[in-house]
Amino acid sequence: VAIFNESGLTLDLPDGLHFRFADLLAYKLLSGQNLKETDFAWIDGGKLFLLEVRSYAQVSTTLTGADLIPLKGQAVPHRFEALIDKLTDSLLMLLAAWADTDCGKSIKAGLPAAAKSRMPLKLVIAIEMPSTLSVHLSGLRDSLNARMRGRIALADVRNVALIDYARLLANPTFSAFVKAQV
């Protein structure tokens, strides 16, 4: 069992069935080249889950919907762009591993045995934000999926799930692995 604490959550991930890109030697060699990664990955029920967790609780007094959701004719918010980069780069790393490219072989070497072969993916972003901003979750989810639609289609992923911490902790798919920090 591997236990991680991040962004107000404790993750208890199954031995031999999880990884963090950040811990892979191949990723460490590439990370200085503007490559990003999702926080956690684990296998459950024949699917590979990629999870990014973000807590905006500390910046709740200054955060607005415009800090999260792109508006037509304006610069894309950096928080939104960071999520796009993390998902896209994580998909690229997995697809490279499964395609056995030179870099992909190095990435594959660090993956659990079950993740070394192509498998169905679930992309999940869990966000903690104050209730005053929760009204923006659906807009953020829709904007994120619109921007990612072509990219995720290349990996046979239908959509990105964007949920708040309460839904993450209440969902049986995740509650076996994820708890709120005490």
Predicted segment positions?
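Flexible, glycine-rich phosphate/dinucleotide-binding loops
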Residues: F49, V59, T132
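Polybasic (Lys/Arg-rich)
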Residues: V1, T132-V182
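Structural motif
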Residues: K47-F49, K122
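Basic, amphipathic N-terminal segments that precede the first structured/catalytic domain
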Residues: V1-T38, P172-V182
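Flexible, charged surface loops at secondary-structure boundaries
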Residues: Q33, W42-G45, K116-R118
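Catalytic cores of nucleic-acid endonucleases
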Residues: Y56-A126, A146-R158
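Short beta-alpha junction loops
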Residues: I127-S131
